[in-house]
């Protein structure tokens, strides 16, 4: 457990109580009175740094936390329940819903406030984590506001359908994919034995309850109902979430602050061309800085509120 003393800044491991074992993350506290941000990871096995076992090494959350710390803003970046440092929190990391992640966010808020004395905590969600942040802001107390980074403005079932349609290799499987998305979007599970093997990682029985919980939520509706300050940050070179998503969020929540970043992709790295391979290569590079403007936009927004 990270303990605060007189030595500032504080950087180290921090724990929160999970269902069966500890939830774990990394805290950066540049000063005792620093505003605090909880960084909520995106989809799948994404760790507290923003990396995953499939080879993603871009570490956007670690770089973001470090950059914010240099500007006097504290953070806690976390491993999701059942994964990585939080592996003991639950037995099955797939047996989860958005509500479960919201519950965990509430626990983290309590721990952060007790450790730092912060009156409230900002929720920063990246990609799917933005959906969790919006849902949490609607239900939890002591939330300063929401920072949406590369967050879809449509139900995630629609986003997934669009991503699959853009992949020519999936074309022969689109009837099955559309059926699965349609059924899950209305809360019905799909017979896993009838799902083509190529689609099993997406629609397998183990993840269907989670998909049902995410597909049921419209991020734009959640943003519309959020009275707290909202920052909508979107990169123009993002291959997974578009500027149109950011515009839909802003139309639903006109009180939000948009930040559209040129030449910035989904993992917050600089991509100067339309070349897809060049874009994806940044996901696997561990030596690239964040794109210009990412840290500054968040820092300005938090300090203004």
Task: Label each region the model flagged.
Residues 147-220:
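Accessory cap/linker subdomain of secreted extracellular hydrolases
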Residues 228, 241-252:
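Short alpha-helix in the alpha/beta-hydrolase fold that links the catalytic acid
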Residues 93-114:
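Alpha/beta-hydrolase active-site loop
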Residues 226, 232-234:
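Short beta-strand/loop motif that positions the catalytic acidic residue
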Residues 59-87:
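Conserved alpha/beta-hydrolase
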Residues 4-32, 36:
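N-terminal cap/lid segment of alpha/beta-hydrolase-fold proteins
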Residues 264-267, 273-305:
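Catalytic active-site module of serine/aspartate enzymes centered on a nucleophile-bearing elbow/loop
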């Amino acid at each position: 457990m990270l303990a605060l003393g007189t030595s500032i800044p504080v950087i180290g491991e921090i724990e929160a109580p999970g269902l069966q074992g500890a939830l774990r993350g990394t805290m950066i506290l540049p000063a005792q009175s620093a505003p605090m941000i909880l960084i909520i990871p995106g989809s799948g096995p994404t760790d507290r740094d923003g990396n995953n076992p499939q080879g993603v090494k871009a570490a956007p959350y670690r770089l973001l936390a470090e950059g914010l710390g240099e500007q006097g803003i504290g953070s806690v970046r976390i491993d999701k329940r059942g994964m990585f440092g939080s592996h003991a929190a639950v037995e099955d990391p797939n047996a989860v819903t958005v509500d479960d992640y919201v519950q965990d966010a509430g626990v983290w808020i309590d721990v952060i406030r007790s450790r730092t004395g912060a009156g409230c905590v900002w929720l920063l969600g990246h990609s799917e984590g933005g959906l969790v942040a919006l849902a949490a802001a609607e239900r939890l107390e002591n939330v300063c506001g929401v920072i949406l980074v590369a967050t879809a403005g449509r139900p995630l079932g629609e986003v997934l359908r669009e991503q699959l349609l853009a992949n020519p290799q999936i074309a022969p499987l689109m009837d099955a994919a559309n059926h699965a998305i349609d059924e899950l979007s209305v809360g019905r599970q799909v017979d896993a034995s009838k799902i083509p093997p190529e689609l099993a990682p997406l629609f397998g029985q183990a993840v269907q309850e989670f998909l049902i919980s995410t597909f049921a939520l419209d991020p734009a509706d959640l943003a519309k109902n959020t009275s707290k300050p909202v920052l909508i940050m979107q990169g123009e070179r993002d291959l997974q979430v578009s500027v149109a998503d950011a515009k839909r969020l802003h139309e639903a929540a006109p009180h939000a602050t948009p930040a559209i970043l040129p030449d910035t992709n989904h993992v917050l790295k600089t991509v100067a061309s339309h070349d897809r391979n060049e874009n994806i290569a940044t996901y696997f590079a561990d030596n690239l800085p964040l794109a210009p403007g990412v840290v500054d936009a968040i820092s300005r927004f938090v300090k203004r509120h």
